[in-house]
Amino acid sequence: MQTLLKIFLGGGLVLALSRPGHAQQTPPDPATHATLSDPEGRPPDSAHIPFVLPKDIKWTGDPKRQETAVLFGDQSKEGPYGVLIKWHPGAFSRPHFHDQTRWIYVVSGTWWVSSSNVYDEKTTYPFHAGTFSTDVANTVHWDGARSGEKEPAVILLTGMGPVKTVQVDENGKPLPPRAPAKE
């Protein structure tokens, strides 16, 4: 648990430092005059310090609704994982729960969350950038970004896999799995 929290906090710090605008606020190094946006020298050895620059993050999904970028691990397999989720304004999940506890850090924007079994945007609560949250195992919730937001909500989601997600009805009872889409 402590190791996972260190991974989470370390990943969150790296992401927070790589947010747009941070480089302009960082004063140059007095010895080299380098800034985060204009580094001098070579990047760290990736065998010692693996890294992915923001421009190299691979986003998948619907750019009008929800996009996902896997940073490390795989939530369908055993072990730790870290995923960025980008909720575009007006996009929400449906009520569901996960069988494993997960930890969330809001990187940017406003992430709207509800613990209601009923899908109604009026029951969501805003978690602004910088908010940390725990998604307790087997508790119903749903989340996304409200219509009218000026930017997507980006969250860093971490946990231990494998994790199973179960959609629920308005009574909180599991729904049967959806049939695969036909081509």
Predicted regions and their residues:
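Bacterial N-terminal signal peptides
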Residues: K6-A16
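Sec/Tat signal peptide C-region and signal peptidase I cleavage site
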Residues: R19-A23
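A short, N-terminal "cap"/entry segment at the start of jelly-roll beta-barrel domains
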Residues: Q25-Y81, E170-E183
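Short acidic-glycine-tyrosine-enriched beta hairpin
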Residues: S76, W111, N117-T139
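Conserved short histidine dyad/triad with adjacent acidic residue
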Residues: E78-H98, F127, V136-N138
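Short beta-strand His + acidic residue motifs that chelate non-heme Fe in jelly-roll/DSBH
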Residues: S93-P95, V113-S114, D135, V140-G148
